Amino acid sequence: MQIKGHRICGGRATGPALVSKDAISFLGGVDPGTGTVIEKGHALYGKNVKGTVLIFPGGKGSTVGSYVIYQLMKNGVAPAAMINIKAEPIVAVGAIISGIPMVDRLEQNPVETIKDGDTVTVDGTAGIIELS
């Protein structure tokens, strides 16, 4: 199944979905050395974003979050791709400077349509995702 969206950052990646209904603060919410979500009370607390297609409504918190996403990439623990309901500048810039394929504004709500563990391919260049 293909779902059309809006391109944020080009590229193509496939991975298992990691889905959250909670917004993510990368600064203080995700350990840049390990990729583990460390924000207490977060739906993904204790889970690791490495190699996943990370699906969440959008970002929250400090503008430094862009650089935390970049650190995740430099440390080899970044998500393979990201999907937001509606991206905001912090996460979008983080994806762009890190070269992480990213889309938002899909025709269907990704948080409701996609389940943890589903195999998802993000074609950031075309603004399309594929579920298999």
From Swiss-Prot:
Task: Indicate the enzyme's highest-level EC class.
Answer: lyase
What pathway annotation does it carry? Isoprenoid biosynthesis; isopentenyl diphosphate biosynthesis via mevalonate pathway
Q: What is this protein called?
A: Phosphomevalonate dehydratase small subunit
Entry-linked Gene3D superfamilies = Phosphohistidine domain
| Matches recorded under SUPFAM superfamilies | LeuD/IlvD-like
Give the organism the record lists: Methanocella arvoryzae (strain DSM 22066 / NBRC 105507 / MRE50)
- Residue positions of the active site: 62
Q: Lineage of the native species?
A: Archaea, Methanobacteriati, Methanobacteriota, Stenosarchaea group, Methanomicrobia
Entry-linked Pfam families: AcnX_swivel_put
Superkingdom per UniProt: Archaea
What is the protein's quaternary organization? Heterodimer composed of a large subunit (PMDh-L) and a small subunit (PMDh-S).
